[in-house]
Amino acid sequence: MFLPQEFIRRKRDGQPLDRDDMAAFVRGVTDGSVTEGQVAAFAMAVYFNDLSTDERVALTLAQRDSGDVLDWRALDLGGPVIDKHSTGGVGDVVSLMLGPMVAACGGYVPMISGRGLGHTGGTLDKLSAIPGYDVMPDTDAFRRTVREVGVAIIGQTARLAPADKRIYAIRDVTATVESVAMITASILSKKLAAGLDGLVMDVKVGSGAFMPTAEKSAELARSIVDVGNGAGMKTTAILTDMNQSLAPCAGNALEVACAIDYLTGKSRPARLHDVTMALSAELLVTGGLARDAAHAREKLQQALDSGAAAERFARMVAALGGPADLLDAPARHLARAAVIVPVPAPVSGVVQRVDCRALGLAVVALGGGRTRAEDAIDVSVGLSALAEIGQRIEAGEPLGFVHARDEAAAAHAVDAIRRGYVLGETGEAPPTLYQRVD
């Protein structure tokens, strides 16, 4: 007979846990026979005593199996089922371009995304800025869109990895969110439940990253790669920079407009392009759609230049209820804030440092993000034309623009942005891409 308290005691005392007991514990989490207190005690025991790679794989697979696991084989897709996941940041709109680009190169991307929480923006919130786009379609519509278009970006249903949802909610209020072992299981259980053949992980490093230090980011990347592969899914990771907003804008409608400009060739900001191409190329190689990174980049550039990637995005939006002419007339459909004001630089100088987290929190304060999961958001607000590290700015020139509901909110955001920028005599942009982990 399985006793949760004995299972917890073993981890408390630093003893190994076997796969069958891990599965029994997670089944108890799902059916309610394991109490909230027991989940909290287990999470704290893991926080202090950690999990081995084998234990992390066992927890991940048990959480995957707590609900539905999508199986794409019956659809006979004719290409690999692959996806990218980011640890989150500010101005991280990569998913909206990567999904259609990879689909245009022969991949199938069933991307199950989250909403933003804290200072990081969520892909689902960005898509909610598109009128009519259904972020929670039924499974048939999701599968049909993936089959016909090659990409569908939707939200996590209650039937995918439900144990993870309960464990995460308890970790969130018991000071155990930071456990790398449990972050790994949380991310990968959902990706494995999506039925993926391969995954590329974008792990952010810097002032706007989820992990507090570069060392912790590297530790998470290594854990995800080892556990993903251990669970039977080809997994690699790239450590990318989040010391400043990735796109020159942050905020939901603004980022959708940025993605459309990127796909249609109107504007491809250098850092955003570097990260998008690196992750997309990694996915094509992972899925066997390209010989190497150079071949993959060639195919991806062709998908952009020919308009094939933009067409996939337009078809995905239309298939999931959005306007068919979004790419032709984004301004007609995307909400625009009532007040748009510049953020004047207090002094002349070169941008030395940006408090990226402060930029994300400024968007939240404007109403563009959440402090609680149930908060509603204003998709029109945010920041645009943000100055980059290494850029020279004269006193009075804009560090960026604030898009706000009213003058008072705009004034608060202007102050926050000015405090978030450090200008000096010299400044050098950090690398965009740090390291590949396989």
Curated annotation (Swiss-Prot):
One Gene Ontology biological process: thymidine metabolic process
Family statement drawn from the similarity comment of this UniProt entry: Belongs to the thymidine/pyrimidine-nucleoside phosphorylase family.
Keyword annotations: Glycosyltransferase, Transferase
Catalytic activity: thymidine + phosphate = 2-deoxy-alpha-D-ribose 1-phosphate + thymine
InterPro entries, per the entry: Glycosyl_Trfase_fam3 (IPR000312), Glycosyl_Trfase_fam3_N_dom (IPR017459), Glycosyl_Trfase_fam3_N_dom_sf (IPR036320), Nuc_phospho_transferase (IPR035902), PYNP-like_C_sf (IPR036566), PYNP_C (IPR013102), Pyrmidine_PPas_bac/euk (IPR018090), Pyrmidine_PPase_CS (IPR017872)
GO terms of molecular function: 1,4-alpha-oligoglucan phosphorylase activity; thymidine phosphorylase activity
General function of this protein: The enzymes which catalyze the reversible phosphorolysis of pyrimidine nucleosides are involved in the degradation of these compounds and in their utilization as carbon and energy sources, or in the rescue of pyrimidine bases for nucleotide synthesis.
Top-level taxon: Bacteria
Keyword Transferase in record: yes
Segments forming a coiled coil: none
Keyword RNA-binding: no
Subunit (UniProt): Homodimer.
Pathway(s) where this gene product acts: Pyrimidine metabolism; dTMP biosynthesis via salvage pathway; dTMP from thymine: step 1/2
UniProt-listed Gene3D superfamilies: Nucleoside phosphorylase/phosphoribosyltransferase catalytic domain, Pyrimidine nucleoside phosphorylase-like, C-terminal domain, Transferase, Pyrimidine Nucleoside Phosphorylase, Chain C
Cellular component per GO, a single term: cytosol
The name this protein goes by in its record: Thymidine phosphorylase
EC number: 2.4.2.4
